[in-house]
């Protein structure tokens, strides 16, 4: 197999290829040959990569630090609930609420993760759909018209016809028609169908585009028919190599910047949680283990209380629950989903949620040219003819960049009655042409060759020769309904005037095509269009503006060639136009019955017919840049994002477009910025890295898939965050490898779309820039709500730590903390995702990959705010037990018993207090319920703590609502960034308070969460205790602003 794999079939003659593959054109392979080769090469099908089993995918979802901590907390909570060891937290169903909710969250998270993973490799499935199902094959001297394509082997002789999908990589052995065109844009990125022939290509190391005698699996024959020799099948085909590259790229997929930050944060949080949990448990060791000491150091009479040990262990578990922001994954997912909706409104369809955030830190955009930077609609931008004499030219500029006949026109067109020369231009462009235009999906599209469609649109902009006749065709220029052909009235007028009687098809030798038409005067005329140099070389005369003919001499040829050179330097594709009236034996040709018809069946005779031509003019066409791309390139430059254009087009065209879109300045030296793919790859690795690391734009032309992948891989190794655009099958590996793969929605193949992270509905580069801006805004908002949620959790941790350190009863139980983290915090955190974007968001450089979510100053703020949260929640608990009033507001209106702070600290020793301690019943819910302690006064510190625990929980909720207002802006005061700037946040706060009231005032839920209703007086106390968090953070923001101003001044003076 190695021998065939290394055999460059394109660089060898057909006879040598037949000898190499041991086959014959007249008989094909024998059945015995097929069997032997089948055993050696296998079937012609793409390999099925082994996917991960379901159980493996499920386990992977739990391979996360935070998830492992939650699993541990859930397991311990379940065991303690099952053993009935929960101290003062109820029994039965209520005891299992906490582990049940945690496990439910983890299961939902795993389901989403498995679903995303199982859909990740759809690109490979889409690739398989491109494969051909059957082929017309010659074996044992017999034609098999519908042999299953999977049964092909190297050496098979296959016939291809118009519309056939190529079943394998094959060497063209001969054409059965004058020309053969294959649509291979999905594989190579070439915009137009490619001419194929049987002549060898004298290059062993040849680009895919240069293999003009090869047809590739998955491409389609659009014109002509041929006979081919199968050279590669299955995974050895070009499409097979792409599948292998997609698979390898998927293995190289790295985590998104945010995922890395969250993992890093998770690891640090794990360490902190373990330390604090152990510390909390150890602080209270005297409450569950005691001993006497003899001889100064020997412990005796050791007493151990398993009940109290598990109780304080439960507190440690509660601390873990408090420290972990359980609602964070859900809020992040919600924020990203909201971001996708915003992007969809801007024509950016996000397929993978994490890519929304990754867009925000993009540092390099690698963009294709065709269809992304350009319109992917060929248009004539200028044409020239000779003037009144052979030494002058007339140049006409044409506006409009689409196939819409009414898009633009000919600039300063004063030819209401066209002269003979311009009439010849219009006649050739409209009749020597097989293309058309149709209207679909609010877009004008071409049928046939794009260049020919552009010529027909040019004719519509020119109008018809006589002004008086234009009134008769004006009404029919309106296009029909969606999906139908567009009526090209001017072209129809020319086609009715001059009837086409024969076509001389294009071939690559003469580089032209022509038609014989019957003119109104009864004479035949040959209309020719083709490569401008080739047309000029075969022209003997030229037509002047008045229609007169003059012989072409050297000076007039120089004038034409100079103008042609100017046009090509602008990146225009130039087509020469000519005609011929003296047709000899074809002067009266009218049908296939004509005696000279045999000559028209022989393409080798066409070049003799197309001689002594009359030169008419040259039309310059191009795929024009989108109008908005130049502005988008400048936005990228302002935002610190580098743009690199990677295209399959030739170097001069690519450079011209890049200069026009202002990627390069007009007189910029491009020697270090513009390379062909082959030139770049031939450089040493160190030199390539140096080129890629330099600032400014880059353009890589004639780039192959492997070149794109290598450029992306090198950029990623340099620490860049790379966005890559593509539309073809050949782009799929690079799309998969890039941090952000962006496929084209209009021109993109299904393979490219499935391999991408995002699809552009309008194929427009400026949409990428808008998406980057949205990604940056989303990241800033995510940072706001992450900081908000973490600061809330720090407060919860400090609250539990203070409870344990002071030795008082726990003021909140795990299920309450879980409710706060998941439900109460959720709406405000999500609403912070709606914060308006900063005005200068695209004036700042991309954030660095090592940019911290939490820097030292933010950490100090967390600790200060968290400390207040802890003091407030524990303080209200202590106040209820020990104080009769707070700021003049009575706390004992419910009739509860006051105790000293010392008693509260030593509540676990209550049983030893004897009859000295009694607890009177107190009322809740406006006197509708009484909590009594008749059997055991010590229950006052367990069952009786339901009211102070409710106060602590409500203070925590209220503080976190006020703290969400602080998160509106990282540095700006609420005076400059008022809450109504984000009305969704006010709605979310209302929802969270409403949810809290539901669990307070619905008896069943109140029992589940171990709380009771509060009175109006108690709510007033809650607000008084909670509101200062806003004043504290305002002071911290002021200090932060002063600190930043001081740093800026210091930098300026350095």
Swiss-Prot record:
Any Pfam family the entry gives: Hydrolase
Gene3D superfamilies: Calcium-transporting ATPase, cytoplasmic domain N, Calcium-transporting ATPase, cytoplasmic transduction domain A, Calcium-transporting ATPase, transmembrane domain, HAD superfamily/HAD-like
Membrane side Cytoplasmic: residue ranges: 1-53, 119-262, 331-782, 834-853, 970-982, 1038-1054
Location(s), subcellular: Membrane
Binding site for Mg(2+): 727, 731
GO-annotated molecular function: ATP binding; ATP hydrolysis activity; metal ion binding; P-type calcium transporter activity
Active site: residue positions: 368
UniProt key word Methyltransferase: no
Parts of the chain on the Lumenal side: 75-98, 283-312, 803-812, 877-949, 1002-1016
Function comment: This magnesium-dependent enzyme catalyzes the hydrolysis of ATP coupled with the translocation of calcium from the cytosol to an endomembrane compartment.
Protein name listed in UniProt: Calcium-transporting ATPase 2, endoplasmic reticulum-type
Species of origin: Arabidopsis thaliana (Mouse-ear cress)
Name of encoding gene: ECA2
